[in-house]
Amino acid sequence: MYSLFKNIKFPNHWIPPIEFENKEQVKEKYFKRYCELGFYNENSIKDKVMNSSSVLLSYYFFSVAKNDQEFNLGYDIMAAFFSTDDFFDGKPENYNNQTAKERIFNIIKNEGNCSFSDFNQNEKFLIKYIIDSKEYSKNNSNKQILYYKILQGWIDYVESLGPYNLLENYSYNETIHLFIRRFDIAYLPACDLAIMMVIENLNISIMYHPKYCLMHLDLAKSLSLINDLHSFEKEFLDGQIKNNYLYKIIEKGNDNKSFDVGSFDIGVKKIFNDINKLNQSAENYEKELLEEFQLKLNEKQFDEFKKVITASLLINGGNLVWGNTNARYSTKNSIFIELKEKYEESCTTYLNTKSLFG
């Protein structure tokens, strides 16, 4: 992993297997399949990057997937997320367009059965995910509950995009930023999908235990901060940096609005500290939940409960690994690529521009 992330503390059991066999062949297979379905353009570099990101994220987020059907669900929900994010992020003409949101809500309301004559790319992926996950979950009541919970989470995610994009117009407020970000990052529906893959007979009411809910709140915030570190370079190059958490910290701490090695170092260390506190809190909840339910459940139920907890935690570890291995955040022309690889020695080379706060 890049040394930029060496000070982030993750328990080992949160990290999924890093080696991905036949990775390039899997990417090629999925890109060809979705070109044939009309989701991708075979000549589009953007589509190739999104396909690569979706394959890798499905592998690292959903390492609990047991078969191609579950891997496909992971791919589709991630591709739907990426394409929806690209459609709305930093584009007020889209996130202020009520019709664009209503089309998505119509797809969800009708569970993928829509009468539109044409679809945006993000709508195609969402429809495919909804139809396939409904079929996947139909014979298990727990999975059906999660199927609907994920759709609710997708509504919350889409509704958060407008407020999140408006944050750049207001002074930095850490509490508000992280509150919106826990929805905007789409962690919760992704996590519920991972749990859907492992839950069978466990009483699903356990997922509404206060400690379980608080653990997920910490995990969602932690994931959003790690994602902001991963995406800093991409958002800088795209001109969409002003809502990045690291940017906000640097901006708040600089009266002269300069972007130098010192301010960057302070900002990164604060995020490391925030992430580590959140991870430690989540790990404490994990331990407390396991201790509590080991006394309440029989051996078979407890084994399933541990799988549910693990599926949640692997999302965060998978996000840490994924962001360091995909083209979406690691482009060759990135002004921060060397910074990621060799933090202390390279930061003075690149972090010497005032245009960041223009």
UniProtKB/Swiss-Prot annotation:
Q: What class of enzyme is it?
A: lyase
Keywords from the UniProt entry: Lyase, Metal-binding
Keyword Iron part of the UniProt annotation: no
* This protein's record includes keyword GTP-binding: no
Question: What SUPFAM superfamilies has UniProt attached to this entry?
Answer: Terpenoid synthases
**Which positions does the motif NDxxSxxxD/E motif occupy?**
227-235
Q: Name one GO molecular function term.
A: terpene synthase activity
Q: What is known of its domains?
A: Contains several highly conserved motifs that are important for catalytic activity including the aspartate-rich 'DDxx(x)D/E' motif and the 'NDxxSxxxD/E' motif, both of which are involved in complexing metal ions to coordinate the binding of the isoprenyl diphosphate substrate in the active site.
Q: What does this protein do?
A: Terpene synthase that converts its substrate farnesyl diphosphate (FPP) into the sesquiterpenes beta-elemene, valencene; alpha-selinene, 7-epi-alpha-selinene and a yet unidentified sesquiterpene.
Q: Which family does it belong to?
A: Belongs to the terpene synthase family.
Q: What is this protein called?
A: Terpene synthase 12
